Amino acid sequence: MNRFFLSILGSLALVFTLTLKGAEKPTHSAVTPAPREGGWMKRHEQFNQNVQAHQGDIDLIFVGDSITQGWEGAGKAVWETYYGHRKALNLGIGGDRTQHVLWRLDHGNLEGISPKVAVVMIGTNNSGDDRNTADEMVDGITAVVHKLKAKLPETKILLLGIFPRGENFNDQRGKILQVNQAIQKLQDWKRVQYLDIGHRFMERSGSIPKAIMPDFLHFSTAGYGIWASAMEKRISTLLKDRPVEMTHADFSGEWTFSIQGPNGQMVDSPLNIKQNGARIRGSMTMGPDRSFALEHGGIFGDQIAFTITRDRPQGGQMIYQLKGTLKDQRLEGKVTAKMDGETTTIDWSAKR
């Protein structure tokens, strides 16, 4: 047998080996369906009850982790505005990774339903250094998409790029960028569409403002407003309904902030608000020449939220978390004051 023939056989053997290897299914943790314990199972079972109760009456589902679950918390008002009329169901569980979603999809979360659209945003909890590589994350997300396609043959899938996390660029963000670049290839415009809106949550410098993500991972109400707005056109097109047109009230200007003091008397303070879309900044003056910046400020519709941090002369801090609603050019709301582990909530108001 001559050398040329042997080399041909060797090349064919190598190609055959690589083909078999490429055909093998990955077996790492991100693609191995796995349940969790405790409250997770209780929420999973509640999902199963929900889908049973709404058989044939669900048009839109959201599949994900704590960021998706947060539609029931900080994102509740946004959800009601954008999805309350759309027969939508939230299937997000805090802490979930791709393997946990895979298990849920096999154990009742999709039983008997056929939504028009499934929004998927999963993977950030797989991105820790000791968890999965970028390639493994891609495998996990791909497995979730394939599972949805198989179990929901009539459903269009809107796959979202994993949202950025961390105040500034870091290794974890870098890994997420690699993953997003790869999973966009799952888009076929027939069953799967891909949408990356991560830039909507960042400043031009690449930093993430606390007004959008207070802990640089989970959204504030304003953050959920940005999320909903960014994908509304795509959602509306897929559902074949009228898009939601959201406008924010104008909070800009000089206000007089009023709150009841320790002696029962009303105390007035100047409040300055500057608004840029769903974000706000500004200051409040308390006492002579003591101005405090409005932190983590954001708005949604006619609702506003911000935080003020005040250093105490004897040490420590007072943290005031304010939420309010604009009614006939008057702001009314609640302020929660936190100090030394104790919390107090009282009413406040403001007028221009």
Located regions from the model:
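Second-shell loop/turn segments in exported
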Residues: A88-L91, S127-A134, E167-N170, M213-H218
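Structural recognition of the beta-strand scaffold that forms the well-ordered cores
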Residues: D59-G64, K87-G92, K116-I122, K156-G161, ...
